[in-house]
């Protein structure tokens, strides 16, 4: 952090947005429509971020997309689902800010910027009480970024890739004045800006911060974007900003190993199970894929096997990542459980016992000892399929505390003039624990808070 009351940049703009993922691009669209001259600085050679690595699913209630599909949902119910999952540990005002604004943001992106959304209504994601996962037609995060990038280009918003922001500039009275960017060749650029929006996500790629705040995942596979180096947290500490829930994160218990491909949790929600190398189940797969990362990593060899059938394989093929896993030969099939166990190199007897147990539970529509409900319509039938998986860290959920206009708050309760945060740079809605993550919380805060931050620029700064 540099202090320079006389700072003058090579470039002068109204709003510098650090990060070119869903949060940053949404903020850029909103800020530009507010009349701001915007620069998006992206450290990589193309726009991507954690969004491009995700499935691109955005939860929202009472949207136009839901109405078109005759899905009756409410923001009140969505709010309750989030709070129940995080055990009421997140700030309800912050959660409400996200729930209210994600509806506005998605309807706006669709109506004003031509981004086509539909709602996935084949299955419910863990702990959601309604169909509310919105996606673009391709159902990938990369496609979502592409739509946002095209919208940004249509507004002639300036995007500068290969520009890594390495320092912020503030005045002696604490106002943000600009930043210093660095190019791959080592050259630097000074940027004067009335406002800065931090859209640089969290710190999943910073091993020191992970060891400090999430030690249980310091040796896990990191499945997020390598550029998530925690600048928001580092700069926030230097600015004496309020920071919370740094122990919170999204994990995932279903990453094909060693292929490194995400395998959709829809397979578990619609009847699949996970077993360890001993052929035994070890948890309630319906609690959530985030906390399942820890459960899988606690198993022998830190691996598990997803077991499913032809019906679920067809469901999986609706997702590009699953199709990639098939092409990579990560998916194993067999006509019998005995053959499947042999192919997986796990004990035949215990796996057969497990399958008999879950079949009996399904036949009786019963609840198992882990608390999972089984039902007869989702009984697994031959041929059987399996994929070897491990647990992974996806992205962190703690960050800078902001107000309802996305302004960063200091420990003394005042605002850092000119500084805003959204997405993973801001504290999320999942609370301080891995189990608090509700499916889609990442893109929920990225797009809703990006929208809030961009819209706030005109009202406060310009």
Roles of regions detected by a PLM:
Residues 1-15, 33, 462:
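Extreme N-terminal leader/targeting segments of oxidoreductases
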Residues 2-6, 37, 43-158, 162-164, ...:
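Conserved N-terminal/central alpha/beta ligand/cofactor-binding core
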Residues 9-10, 29, 322, 398-462:
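C-terminal structured subdomain/cap of oxidoreductase catalytic cores
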Residues 15-40:
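N-terminal Rossmann-like FAD-binding beta1-loop-alpha1 element of flavoenzymes
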Residues 184-255, 443-452, 456:
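Glycine-rich loop(s) and the adjacent beta-strand/alpha-helix scaffold that form part
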Residues 161-175:
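A conserved short coil-to-beta-strand element within the FAD-binding core of flavoproteins
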Residues 167, 350-433:
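A glycine-rich dinucleotide-binding beta-alpha-beta segment and adjacent secondary-structure elements
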Residues 233-346, 350:
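An anion/pyrophosphate-binding glycine-rich loop and adjacent beta-alpha core
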């Amino acid at each position: 952090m540099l202090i320079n009351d006389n700072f003058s940049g090579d470039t002068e703009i109204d709003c510098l947005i650090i990060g070119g993922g869903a949060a940053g691009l949404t903020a850029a669209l909103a800020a530009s429509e507010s009349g701001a001259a915007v620069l998006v600085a992206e450290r990589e050679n193309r726009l991507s971020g954690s969004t491009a690595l995700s499935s691109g699913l955005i939860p929202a209630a009472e949207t136009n997309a839901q109405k078109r599909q005759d899905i009756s949902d409410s923001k009140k119910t969505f709010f309750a689902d989030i709070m129940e999952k995080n055990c009421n540990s997140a700030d309800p005002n912050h959660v409400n800010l996200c729930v209210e604004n994600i509806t506005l943001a998605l309807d706006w992106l669709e109506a004003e910027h031509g981004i086509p959304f539909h709602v996935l209504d084949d299955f419910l994601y863990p702990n959601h009480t309604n169909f509310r996962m919105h996606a673009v037609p391709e159902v990938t995060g990369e496609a979502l970024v592409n739509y946002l990038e095209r919208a940004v280009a249509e507004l002639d918003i300036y995007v500068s890739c290969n520009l890594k922001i390495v320092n912020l500039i503030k005045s002696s009275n604490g106002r943000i004045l600009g930043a210093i960017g660095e190019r791959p060749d080592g050259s630097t650029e000074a940027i004067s800006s009335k406002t800065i929006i931090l859209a640089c996500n969290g710190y999943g790629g910073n091993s020191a911060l992970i060891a400090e705040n999430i030690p249980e995942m310091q040796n896990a596979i990191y499945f997020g974007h390598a550029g998530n180096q925690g600048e928001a947290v580092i700069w926030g500490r230097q600015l004496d900003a309020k920071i919370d829930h740094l122990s919170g994160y999204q994990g995932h218990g279903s990453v094909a190993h060693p292929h490194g491909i995400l395998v959709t949790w829809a397979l578990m929600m619609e009847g699949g199970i996970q077993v360890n190398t001993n052929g035994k189940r070890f948890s309630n797969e319906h609690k959530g894929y985030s906390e399942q990362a820890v459960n899988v990593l606690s198993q022998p060899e830190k691996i598990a096997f997803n077991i499913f059938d032809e019906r679920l394989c067809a469901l999986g093929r609706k997702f590009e990542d699953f199709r990639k896993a098939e092409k990579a030969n990560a998916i194993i099939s067999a006509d019998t459980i005995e053959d499947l166990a042999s192919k997986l190199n796990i004990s035949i007897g215990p796996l057969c016992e497990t399958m008999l147990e879950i079949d009996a539970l399904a036949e009786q529509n019963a609840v198992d000892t882990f608390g999972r409900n089984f039902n007869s319509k989702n009984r697994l039938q031959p041929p059987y399929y399996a994929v070897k998986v491990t647990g992974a860290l996806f992205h962190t959920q703690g960050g800078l505390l902001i107000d309802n206009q996305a302004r960063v708050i200091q420990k003394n309760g005042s605002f850092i003039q000119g500084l805003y945060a959204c997405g993973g740079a801001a504290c999320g809605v999942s609370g301080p624990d891995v189990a608090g993550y509700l499916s889609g919380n990442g893109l929920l805060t990225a797009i809703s808070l990006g929208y809030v931050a961009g819209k706030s620029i005109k009202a406060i700064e310009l």
